[in-house]
C-alpha cells in the first residue's frame, strides 16, 4: 500500500525526540510536546496549486524542519504519519 | 439518477470504519467519529474555477484521504454521500 | 414580466420537500428546514465576474444541489424564488 | 445639477413599496423595511475598477433588484437616492 | 507651501453644511455631523497603486461625494483638509 | 553606521511638534501625541515587493505626511527613527 | 551539519543586548525583552514563493533589523537560531 500525496503535499514522519537530540538539534521548550523535525516519506508531483506553479524542492528521505502544528495525521500499519504542504517546510537539514 | 458535480467538485462516499481498519490505515482518536477515507464516486470536469485552470487528478473509484469535515452531505436512495472540492483531497491510496 | 440575472447569477426555485423525497434524494436532518434542491429558472450571461471569465454550465430547467443558505429571496406573483451565484451550485442532478 | 458616478458605481432610486407590489414582485417579510427594487438614474463609465476591467450592463431607466443594504444615501432637491456598485445589482426586471 | 498627494490619493476640503444645502443636496440625518461633499484641492499622479494602474478621473476643483469617514485629517495654515484615496470618491457633482 | 532599508521601506524621523507648527501645518487634536510629519532619512531601492513592481517616489530629505501609527521604531546613536513602507506616506510637503 | 532554508526563508541569530548597545543602536523599551537585531547565518535560494518571484537581497553575514516576533526558533548544538522570511527584514545595518 502506498500513499500518493496530491499537488504540493508531502507525507512526513516526525522523528522521535531522542533521535532529534542525538542529531544535535534541540527544539525549544515551547514545542516540547511535538517534535518539529521530520523525514520526508512521499512527495506530491507539485504542478498548479491554487493557480500557481509549485516546484517541489524537498525529496524523499530529506530531513526537514516543519513550521507548524498543522497537517493531517494518519496511521498506516500502526505507524503515525502526517500530510503537510511543502510550504510548511522551513528548511532542510544536511548532515 | 446521476449526480454530476460542477467544476472541481467531486462526489465521495466515506468508507465505514471497519473497511478502513481492514485496509491497514487507522485514523487517530481525534477523528474517530468521522472516517476520513472515502471512495470517489463522481468527478467534476475541472476547468476554470475561481479564475484558475484546475486539472482533475482524482478519478472515479480512487480511494482518497480527505482533509476536512467540510463538504455538503446528501442522501441518495438511502445512501449518504458528500460533495467536496478536489483541493480537500490530501492523497490517493494505492493498494 | 421576466427576471434577467446579471453576470454569473441564476434565479432558482427551491423544490418542496415532498418533491425532493419522491426523486430519491433525501437531505440530512441538519438541513431539514430548507430544501437544498432547486430548479434553475433563469441563467445570467456569465462573462467577466470579479475580473475573471465565468462560463455558465447550468441551464434553464436543470435540477441542482445548492451549497448554502446564501442568496437573496424574492417573491414574484406570489411565488418564492432565490437569486444565487453559479458557484453556489454543487452539482446537477440527471434523471 | 447632475450626479456623475465614478467607475462601476450607479445612482439608483428605490421604488416605493406600493409601486413594487403593483408590479407583481413582493419582497419577503425580512426586508419589509427597505424596498430592494430600484430604478437606475445614472450609470458610471465602468473602466478599470480595482485593477479589473468592468463593463457596465445596467442602463439608465432599468428596474433592478439590489442585493444589499449597502450603498451611500444622499438627498438631492428633496429626493432620496443611493449610490451603489454595479456588483450590488442582482438582476434586471423586464416587463 | 503645497501638499503633493502620492499615488491615487487626493487632498480634499469638506464643504460647510450651509454650502451643501444651498447647492440643493442635503445629506441624511445619519451623517449630519460630517458633511460628505468636498472640493478637490490637489490630485496625486495615479500610476501603479498596489500593483494596479490607477488613472485619475477627478480633477482639481471638482465637487465630489465622498464615501466614508476614512481619510487622514490635517490642518494647513488654520484650515482643515483631508487626504483620501480616489476610490473613496463615489461621484462627481456637475452644476 | 548606515541603515539601508529593504524593498519599499523608508527610514524616517518624526519632526518635533514645534517644528511642525512653525511650518504652518497643525495636526488635529486626536493625533496630538504623535506628530505625523516626518523627514525622510533613507529610502529603500523599491523593486519587486509582494510580487508587484514598486517605484520609489519619495526622496532623501523629503518632508512627508505619514498615514499611520504603524512602523517599527529604532534608536540610533540616541536618536529615534521609524521604518515604514512607502505606502504609509500620504503626501509630500513642498515649501 | 547545515541548515538549508527553503524559498525566501533565512536562518538568523539574534544578537545579545550588550552587542546591540555597543553598536550604537538601542531598541525602545517596548521590545526590551527580545533584541530585534540579528546576524544572517544562512539564506534560502529565493525563487517562486507564493507564485511570485522573490530575489534574495540579504546575504550571509549581514546585520539586519527584523520586524516581528514571528519566526520559528530552533536550537542547534546548544545555540538558539530563528528562521524567518526575508520580508520580515526591515533594513540592513552597514558599518
UniProtKB/Swiss-Prot annotation, chains A, B, C, D, E, F, G:
Q: Does the keyword Manganese apply?
A: no
Alphabetical GO CC annotations of the entry are: cytoplasm
Q: Where in the cell is it found?
A: Cytoplasm
Q: Which CDD domains has this protein been placed in?
A: cpn10
Quote the function comment for this protein.
Together with the chaperonin GroEL, plays an essential role in assisting protein folding. The GroEL-GroES system forms a nano-cage that allows encapsulation of the non-native substrate proteins and provides a physical environment optimized to promote and accelerate protein folding. GroES binds to the apical surface of the GroEL ring, thereby capping the opening of the GroEL channel.
Identify the NCBIfam families for this entry.
PRK00364.2-2 (NF001531), PRK00364.2-4 (NF001533)
Q: Under which name does UniProt file this protein? A: Co-chaperonin GroES
Amino acid at each position: 500500500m502506498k500513499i500518493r500525496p496530491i499537488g504540493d503535499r508531502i507525507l512526513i514522519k516526525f522523528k522521535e525526540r531522542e533521535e532529534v537530540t542525538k542529531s544535535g538539534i534541540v527544539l525549544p521548550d515551547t514545542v516540547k510536546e511535538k517534535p518539529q523535525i521530520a523525514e520526508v516519506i512521499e512527495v506530491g508531483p507539485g504542478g498548479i496549486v491554487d493557480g500557481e506553479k509549485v516546484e517541489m524542492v524537498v525529496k524523499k528521505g530529506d530531513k526537514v524542519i516543519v513550521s507548524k502544528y498543522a497537517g493531517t495525521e494518519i496511521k498506516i500499519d500502526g505507524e503515525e504519519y502526517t500530510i503537510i504542504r511543502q510550504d510548511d517546510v522551513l528548511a532542510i537539514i544536511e548532515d
